[in-house]
Each structure stands twice: as C-alpha cells, then as structure tokens.
A protein has these predicted regions:
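A generic alpha-helix structural signal
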Residues: 26-30, 60-63
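Specificity-determining recognition surfaces
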Residues: 1-28, 42-43
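Short loop-to-beta-strand entry elements in the cores of soluble alpha/beta enzymes
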Residues: 40-51
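Glycine/small-residue-rich phosphate/adenosyl-binding loop
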Residues: 49-131
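Small-aliphatic-rich amphipathic alpha-helix that forms the alpha element of a beta-alpha
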Residues: 28-29, 33-34, 116-150
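Glycine-rich, charged/polar anion/phosphate-binding loops
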Residues: 31-35, 102-105
Length: 150
C-alpha cells in the first residue's frame, strides 16, 4: 500500500473481526511503533499486548463502565441549555455525533470480542505527546497488515 493511500484513507475501525492476530504480525506492529520519533529520542513508552480472552473480558468491563460514565455525562451536559457540548450544532453535526456515539457504544458492548488490545503506556511524560507518533506507527503497520484499529 502506498504511504499516501494509508495516510489519506486510514480511519477508526470500531467494528473489527474476531479472528486472532498472528504473533508475527503483532511483533511487526510493535516493532513499527518503537521506531517512531520521540521527544529527545527518549522513547519513553511501554506497550502492553493483551490477547488472553479472560483479561480482555476484565478490561472490557472497565471500558464499558468508563464509556457509560462518559456518554451519560455528555448527554446530561447536552440537556443544559448553557452547555457547550451540543450548543449551536446544526442537524448535520448532531447526526454525526449520534453516529459516532452509536459506533462507540457498539464497541463498548463488544470490546471483549476485539482479538488484540495494545495499551500504549507513557512513562514520565505528563503530556503523553511523545507517544502519539508511536501509536500512529502501530496503527499504520496494522493497516498495512489489513488490520483495523481505533
């Protein structure tokens, strides 16, 4: 795949296949991630790879609880006429918000089915910004292997 095609067409894939990801592809994705640039070349990151079904289920419960809290807070703030969440949104914007929210809600309910979770952890960097290129490299590598990410 041409690099520009990947840059222009990669999107968040919240609905992914449940097929296991082979170890060699996981290693390729992580290898791509750790080659990313970082501030002062500190490479101040760790990646936690989770494929175990039981651990994914436990993380799924945490994710679902967090999503429920987030979406309920968002919806409650939207009810407040002075809130900025949905203030001055036209119908197209509201439809986009609903579509994204529905997709994210689906992921929250089906998170345990995602075959691979990669948790990107930043050490000693309160902004976390140095890890972003590494995550993007990982996502592009996944895309190169035909795997969706979000």
């Amino acid at each position: 795949m041409d690099v520009f095609e990947a840059l222009y067409t990669t999107r968040a894939m919240r609905r992914v296949k449940e097929d296991p990801i082979p170890d060699n592809i996981i290693k390729s994705m992580i290898d791509s991630a750790i080659r990313a640039p970082s501030g002062s070349n500190r490479q101040n990151w760790k990646f936690l790879v989770v494929t175990d079904k039981n651990i994914r289920e436990k993380l799924s419960n945490i994710y679902r609880e967090t999503w429920d809290y987030y979406i309920n807070s968002f919806l409650n703030s939207a009810k407040d006429p002075g809130a900025s969440s949905l203030k001055k949104q036209d119908d197209k914007d509201i439809e986009t918000i609903k579509r994204i929210s529905n997709s994210a809600s689906w992921l929250a309910e089906n998170y345990h089915k995602v075959p691979l979770l990669v948790l990107a952890l930043s050490r000693n960097d309160p902004t976390g910004s140095s890890i972003y290129p590494a995550i993007w490299n990982l996502m592009l590598a996944a895309r190169g292997h035909g795997i969706g990410t979000c």
